[in-house]
Amino acid sequence: GILSTVRATREASFENLYDKSKKLLDYMLLHGVTTVEAKSGYGLDWETEKRQLDVVGALDRDHDIDLVSTFMAAHAVPPEYKGRSQEYLELIVEEMLPRVKAENLAEFCDIFCEKGVFTADESRYLLSKAKEMGFKLRIHADEMESIGGVDVAAELGATSAEHLMMATDEGIRKMAEAKVIGNLLPATTFSLMEDTYAPARKMLEAGMAITLTTDSNPGSCPTANLQFVMQLGCFMCALTPVEVLNAVTINAAYSVNRQDKIGSFDTGKQADITILDAKNIDYPLYFFATNLTHQVYKAGKLVVDQGRIV
């Protein structure tokens, strides 16, 4: 679980985290990914949270993939604050968030709003303070139960809400009205062997924009294969091929606040292009469990060619 990974991350050096993360990014690049949102959240103390964010910054400079950083110290309540979740959030607000902002370590702030983790009121408290400091907002909500996280997302104008397997019709309506993007993580549902996938069709019918993302993490979703996630979007979320492609291109660009730079072929945008070995738009979602990437271009430069990083 999360706390097991927290223990391992606290013991890991910068170099160890960098090397492991670089391997994941290489794998993603080989599968056609050119921009990644990376979250902290496996430290739950300042030293380790900063180390994770420093790794993200270093890899953003060093790797062909562009990284967008999210600060998520509110991923869980650390063992040393067990039973004192509000006190831990106050520590984040008073000590961690100002330092993250001062050192420009992250663009977004996220929290896990779920029964047994943080309540809707606690999530509102943290995200309101983060918004005042100039952070863009995300929230993990409605993964196992609907406890008001999507209401917080709508009230505060969050860029996105993640998971949403248990989203209600009313919650979907509120998110659609507030233009909250639904970041759907079907590989997590698959990995946990759950039956309920996010109601993607209801979201689209309500006017929500959605993305499909890997949720790559060592606990609940140990995959970095976006093509597999796209296939789950078709098979388990009833999305069409065009809807899937929108979810991993222009909608994803909006979710990381890069819509003016990436996500579509437009004059003035960066030429991030993935060419698949596929005869039509349907084929990558029909021929599953295979990497179909032929070439990847980052800002117009060839970075992957026939299964190898250039």
Curated annotation (Swiss-Prot):
Q: What is its EC number?
A: 3.5.2.7
Domain of life per record: Bacteria
Q: Which cofactor does it need?
A: Zn(2+); Fe(3+)
Which Gene3D superfamilies does the protein's record reference?
Metal-dependent hydrolases (3.20.20.140), Urease, subunit C, domain 1 (2.30.40.10)
The residues that the entry says bind Zn(2+) are: H140, D215
Does the UniProt entry include the keyword Kinase?
no
The chemistry this enzyme catalyses reads: 4-imidazolone-5-propanoate + H2O = N-formimidoyl-L-glutamate
Q: In which pathway does it act?
A: Amino-acid degradation; L-histidine degradation into L-glutamate; N-formimidoyl-L-glutamate from L-histidine: step 3/3
Cofactor: record remark: Binds 1 zinc or iron ion per subunit.
The positions annotated for binding 4-imidazolone-5-propanoate are Y42, H75, E143, S220
Does this entry carry the keyword Chaperone? Answer: no
Sorted keywords for this record are: Cytoplasm, Histidine metabolism, Hydrolase, Iron, Metal-binding, Zinc
Query: A cellular component term (GO) from this record?
Result: cytoplasm
An example Gene Ontology biological process: L-histidine catabolic process to glutamate and formamide
| Role, per record | Catalyzes the hydrolytic cleavage of the carbon-nitrogen bond in imidazolone-5-propanoate to yield N-formimidoyl-L-glutamate. It is the third step in the universal histidine degradation pathway.
- Sequence similarity: Belongs to the metallo-dependent hydrolases superfamily. HutI family.
Name of this chain's protein: Imidazolonepropionase
